[in-house]
Structures are given as C-alpha cells and as structure tokens.
C-alpha cells in the first residue's frame, strides 16, 4: 500500500482471477491453484497490477495536476496516464502532461514532485537554472527541487532492486 493506492491480494476459489474494487481498495483475487513461481502466472499478476495502477492513476493524477496548475496560474492542455517505465513524467511542447501509472507506487511527496517538475516545463522546456528556480519557487524553498530529484532517483533504484516496474 502507498499514499495513493490500497491493494490487497487474495487467494481465490474459482479457476479465473479477478480485479475488483471495495471502496478505495483494489482487490486482486488470484485464481485457485495459481502458483506465482510459474512465469505465465507472473505475467498475469503483472497485467492485473498494471490495470489497478492505471485505474487509480486516472482517478488521482489529473485532479492533482489541475489543482496545482490552477494554484500556480499555469495552463496545460491535457493529462495522459501511460504505462511508461523509463520516465515518471514528461511535458510536450503542446502543453500535454504525461504521467506514468507507476507513480502510484511512489510516496505522495514524490508524486507531487513529478507533477511540479512537469508543470515547471510549461515555462521552461529544459533543465536550465531557470527551470530549477521555477521548481524551487513552487515549493518556496531554494534547493528543494534538486533534493526531491535525488530522492526520486533513490526511490527508482529501490524499485529496480525489488524488480518493480
């Protein structure tokens, strides 16, 4: 479980698995007799987890972008949620903000860091000193952007060690 995602895995009694929702919690019910040692079953579990993350990301992330963009007086075009493992987010020259569904595994401060990072790109489409100054201005704290960037890198390395995304 994370700040934005509650997930429970249960062993089922039926031959097929299921992804369901009980309030804010996603429940993955595994097929009866499923053995996660089998690579095919691992692929099934990965697909179901990805779908749970996608659904939750579509609920949670666009409103965060909307609220924070409004707070900072910024305009963006659209928010897209993507199954991207190579980057947490991006901002296009058209003002589209793309966010990885895998952000649902991150602590809330890092989710906001990625959102702020992409919002800063609406004004500065690079990582210049002006970009970092814009990001720090969002936080009202000099150096906060680079601090959170390093924290995000450490989080990503930890996920890789655990064989997550």
For the regions a language model picked out, list residue spans one by one.
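Walker B catalytic acidic pair
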Residues: 118
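Walker B beta-strand of ABC/ABC-like P-loop ATPase nucleotide-binding domains
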Residues: 115
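Active-site-proximal or metal-binding-adjacent scaffold patches in catalytic folds
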Residues: 1-112, 122-165
